[in-house]
Amino acid sequence: MERVNAICRHALWRESVDEIARLEQDRAFCRHDRAHFLDVARLAYIENLERGLGVDKELIYAAALLHDIGRHLQYTQNIPHDEAGAQLAEIIMADCGFLPAERAEVTQAILQHRGDGDRSRDGLAALLYRADKASRMCLFCTAEPECNWSREKKNMTIRA
């Protein structure tokens, strides 16, 4: 997990996370912070283990730590956060020693994490999508009534 820890130490990652926090400080809805990134990583890894999918742990954690990293560029430059995040992830992962094929798999997962979410899919992109959605605890959110997520998409029960 040394390369994952290198992501967390990377100046571009830290600056991006700090800028997202600054821009979301008054946000009533779900935030895109370190806790969210780790929730997504852990949920994806649990599903990976439970289903025996064999997706590499480092790639799961890398994708989770990087999937929303482009949020600040969406807020400030109107660039879709998945596209901005994939570009930032490529730079960060290259600096942290990830191989080109690994970077491609993670950036593809980032680009697809807002997709249709076909729950029958396997692989990193599907794990990231499902964990990202499952990480949000709408049941306990005071902003839930104003949230634009559909009722079907909201997590109104605890599932295991």
Task: Name what the model sees in each region.
Residues 1-160:
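Metal-dependent phosphohydrolase cores
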